[in-house]
Amino acid sequence: MYRRSYVFQARQERYERAQPAGPTAQPGGTAPGLAALQALGERVAAQVQRARALQQRHAGLRRQLYAFQRLGEQPGPEEALARHVEANLQRARDLAAEHARLERQEAEAQRALDEFRSKYENECECQLVLKEMLERLNKEADEALLRNLHLQLEAQFLQADISVAKDRYKKNLLEIQTYITILQQIIQTAPQVSLVTGGMREEKLLTEREVAALRNQLDEGREAVTHLQAQKAELQAQTTALEQAIKHAHECYDDEIQLYNGQIENLRKEIEEAERSLERSSYDCRQLAVAQQTLRNELDRYHRIIEIEGNRLSSVFIETPISLITPSHGASLSLGSNVKDLTRAVQDITAAKPRQKALPKSLPKRKEIIAQDKVDETLEDAPLKTLQEPKAVQGELTGDGDSQLGAGGGHEVSPTQEGGPEDVPDGSQISKAFGKLCKVVKERVSGHKEPVPEPPADLFTKGRHILVTGESSFVDPEFYSSSIPARGGVVVSIEEDSMHHDGHVEPSPGQPMPPVENGQGVPQGREGAHSNHQQVTDKNGIRAKEPKDLEEKDDDSRKDDEAGRRPCPVIIPGPDGPSTTHSQTSGSNQGGPEGPGSKSSSLLAKSPSKALSFKKV
């Protein structure tokens, strides 16, 4: 009982302490003395209630103490238990009475709380109303203050204006006084009245005349104004009519103007597109020009490389025995699909490089470059003359070749022997290439088919290599520019020249034949001046070269430098180039122990006289 009453009392005190903090926490309280008084009354009431609770607890403890004392005094347990039960019943009755009293106190406290809450709400509303009123009054006071300041400023300005007006009026007054004094002096010194009246009459007459003239002018001005007003009305009518006509014209021509604007925009776009396409075309033309120059340089370089490699490998062709080909004099070979294999084999042969690249150049290569320089000089001087006398040039070429080859029969010096082991090609690559070449030649010799014209092949350059597309043939090629130029490409057209069997051939410039000087009584002149080296050029551009005498070694170093700067002639074979090539190669290889002169003479005897096409690159 004591614990429950103590807990209830503590909770009630905590609630009472928390409740008064509400109204005092509101800002802007208007009655601090009333709040302090209420708080003091509440604290007094709390202390009174606490004292009552302590008294009740004290009374309960005293009763419990008396009960325990009586229980200790009673000898019988039944009586003690009965007394204890009675005490408990009494305590229950007391607790019930206490509970009823506490309920009444709770109801009273609830009513007091409701009253206090209503009062608090009223106070809050009053505070809000007062706050709004205070704000409104502050605003009104601020506005009044601003108006007061404005009025003060206006009063100051008015005061300044008043002072300025006073000064101005004083000055005017002084001026008026001075005028009055001056008029008084004038009146005192004025003439008689009769003179003044006469002058006034004359002035009156003059003024009347002026008034009449002014009236006439006024009437004329009125008439002019009326006339101008009529003209103005007429002009306004005309302007309205013109405005209506202009509006009508605008409405009529709006569609046409829009159409013309659209056409103008389209034309402008087309012009811009044409300008862009022109810029692209000019850029493409510049690129094509650069590519053309690059291709020309590449072609010159490749022609020089192929010429040098062909001259270097011609010695290998002469010294290597190939006894597999024995074609007849007039056999016609096929130009079919095996041409690609033949071209690939020749490319493999020309791609063979010397093993010892660090060694100096051999003597045959230097002499081949010297022979190329002589061929260039001859080709620059001889074309016009050979076109006029084709048969004579051909006979001279055949006769000189036979005589020079016959004279050089006893002088056997091979280029590979002069070069020595310093300039040895790659044997494995050459053997593979010769194997492929032999297979291709066997297949071509075994069949007798008519030459089929091949479609033109396109040559494209990429970097420092040449890519050949399509199947080319050994007919006479010719470079030309197509109507639709390919980007970075060279188009090659293939033309077939019909060969006549009556001995008439295409005129071609004669090849220079360096004679062999062996001391056996050869004729002097152009054939006998340099008889150490013989050069035979066949239809497909492979030249069989023999070494010159050692007397020209002093000029080799000078002519090696000139060979790199001069343009190389490109010898393009005719339609029957492959058959002539292989027959000459087989004839030169079947010579056996005979000298180079006999090999070349047999080669010229077996090969028919055909035309050679030269193109200066």
From Swiss-Prot:
Residues 78-177 are annotated as: Coil 1B. Residues 540-565 have a biased composition (Basic and acidic residues). Proteolytically cleaved during lens cell fiber differentiation with increased fragmentation as fiber cell age increases. Residues 69-77 are annotated as: Linker 1. Residues 34-68 are annotated as: Coil 1A. Residues 596-617 have a biased composition (Low complexity). Residues 381-429, 499-617 are annotated as: Disordered. InterPro entries: BFSP1, IF_rod_dom. One of its GO terms (molecular function) is structural constituent of eye lens. GO terms for cellular component: cell cortex; cytoplasm; intermediate filament; plasma membrane. The modification Phosphoserine is found at residues 5, 334, 508, 607. The record marks 426-427 as: Cleavage (by CASP2, CASP3, and CASP7). Expressed in the deep and shallow cortices of the retina lens (at protein level). Residues 578-588 have a biased composition (Polar residues). It is found in: Cell membrane; Cytoplasm; Cytoplasm, Cytoskeleton; Cytoplasm, Cell cortex. Residues 33-313 form the IF rod domain. Residues 1-33 are annotated as: Head. This is Filensin.
